[in-house]
From Swiss-Prot:
Native source species: Haemophilus influenzae (strain ATCC 51907 / DSM 11121 / KW20 / Rd)
Protein name per its UniProtKB record: Protein transport protein HofB homolog
Pfam families named among the record's database cross-references: MshEN, T2SSE
Residue ranges of coiled coil: none
Residues the entry annotates as binding ATP: G264, P265, T266, G267, S268, G269, K270, S271
SMART domains to which the protein is assigned, alphabetical: AAA
Protein's gene: hofB
Length: 464
């Protein structure tokens, strides 16, 4: 009987006293991970209820368990074995290969090279990251090279949440793989780069990713902005506006000309508010044009254009062209400078309804911001119909009610987000805010049991 066959009956006792029966069949079932297991000096001991028990010789090798868990999609339980015992078992499982020490050195040496034939673990690892991000509804994926680890974090409902750490030996290959997907220069790690690519999930969903790289002290950092390429429900009720706010917004949207601004920081939901307004306005008798960076949601019946600064196609050039295209409604992704502000105001004064965004903390600050961009007070009064300031707050989880129950997969007490709003509109020869500021709007959501005061404080701070 060969040493390989003897493994069918061989038992191994872990340092914690637990006894395992070694299964070559389990080793064979993990064939795609064998080079990875040898690289980490690790041995699969048992698989049960979709959980994998992994033998290692040191708790410092926990990153191996986390990486293999990511690749296999199974929780991994680390089991400490004697180093000599682990070496003997691995050697019996690979009798026709080089000595275990040489195999470990060989596979670890391979980590310094990006080789196509050894891409499978990296591809599986990235696929698992993408699938996990989709399942958790993450808007951004952060991949960060640290001193000893490669950190993965997902931004879920506006909050960064750490994911299992990955061994740093994968860092360069993951980064190179992502650069290949985004058609970037793999060899350039001294300068930031930006790119895009698509990923098809197990369930045939298409994810669009915007990729940004950044050189750091320990290596490159990558941030991926995820966007699902599928229909999105756009309705005022989903935004979280009150009935009065919805009606006020729709009344202003029904005006033939003027400027409507949505304000707030990055990630406050401004784009969704604009898309919802455009969808409500979208009828066959209206010519609607948008200038965006990038196009986040595709809307049938609307002419959407994306800026391309590399060839000189910026917001200002698109806006000037739009005015020669006989539009009824124009959406400008963002008013960024004096020129775009002037063009937007002139369009709003000459028979067009213009929608855009500004980065200001509240509604009233939008007026001073326009003045800083060179717009005169009388021009603002003649054109500006409505300013909506907004934020997104997390909703209490409908399963656990925010009680942070361990059995709930939200793990944070929250699931999903909803908007809180402040309206500033022209009324009786002056601009008037509606009766709610952002905090009052948020506290109303608290009284309705939608969110809690801690979340309002997190989003708004103490000054709003």
């Amino acid at each position: 009987m060969t040493s390989y066959a003897l493994l069918h009956t061989q038992r191994v006792t872990a340092k914690n006293g637990e006894v395992f029966t070694i299964s070559p069949d389990l080793w064979e079932r993990n064939q795609q991970q064998q080079s990875l297991l040898l690289r980490y000096f690790a041995l699969p001991l048992k698989e049960e209820n979709n959980r994998l028990w992994l033998g290692v010789d040191s708790l410092s090798n926990l990153s191996a368990c986390e990486t293999i868990a990511f690749i296999t999609g199974k929780p991994v339980e680390p089991i400490l074995l004697e180093s000599s015992q682990l070496k003997e078992l691995l050697q019996q499982l690979t009798p026709n290969q080089m000595q275990v020490e040489e195999q470990v050195k060989f596979y670890q040496h391979q980590e310094t090279h990006f080789e196509q034939e050894d891409d499978e673990p990296v591809i599986r690892l990235l696929n698992q990251i993408f699938e996990s991000a989709l399942q958790k509804n993450a808007s951004d994926i952060h991949l960060e090279t640290l001193a000893d680890q490669f950190q993965v974090r997902f931004r879920i409902d506006g909050v960064l949440q750490p994911q299992p750490l990955i061994s740093k030996i994968f860092a360069n290959r993951i980064i190179s793989r992502l650069k290949l997907l985004a058609k970037l220069d793999i060899s350039e790690n001294r300068l930031p780069q930006d790119g895009r690519f698509q990923f098809k999930t197990t369930f045939s969903d298409i994810l669009d990713f915007r990729l940004s790289t950044l050189p750091t002290h320990w290596g490159e950092k990558i941030v991926l902005r995820a966007q699902q390429n599928k229909p999105v429900e756009l309705s005022f009720s989903e935004l979280g506006m009150t009935e009065n706010q919805q009606q006020a917004f729709q009344r202003v949207l029904s005006q033939p000309q003027g400027l409507i601004l949505v304000t707030g920081p990055t990630g406050s939901g401004k784009s969704i508010s604009l898309y919802t307004a455009l969808q409500w306005l979208n009828t066959p008798d209206k010519h609607i044009m948008t200038a965006e960076d990038p196009i986040e949601i595709e809307l049938d019946g609307i002419i959407q254009s994306q800026i391309n600064p590399q060839i000189g196609l910026d917001f200002n050039r698109l806006l000037r062209t739009f005015l020669r295209q006989d539009p009824d409604i124009i959406m400008l992704g963002e008013i960024r400078d004096e020129e775009s502000a002037m063009i937007a105001l002139r369009a709003a004064q000459t028979g067009h309804l213009v929608l855009s965004t500004l980065h200001t903390n509240d509604a009233i600050s939008a007026i001073s911001r326009l003045q800083q961009l060179g717009i005169q007070q009388y021009e603002i009064k003649n054109s500006l119909l409505l300013v909506i300031a907004q934020r997104l707050v997390r909703k209490l989880c409908s399963k656990c009610g925010g009680n942070l129950a361990n059995s709930c997969d939200c793990h944070q007490g929250y699931r999903g987000r909803i908007g809180v709003y402040q309206f500033l509109h022209w009324q009786q020869n002056d601009y008037q805010t509606d009766f709610k500021n952002l905090r009052a709007s948020g506290l109303e959501k608290v009284s309705q049991g939608i969110t809690d005061e801690k979340e309002i404080e997190r989003v708004l701070g103490k000054n709003l």
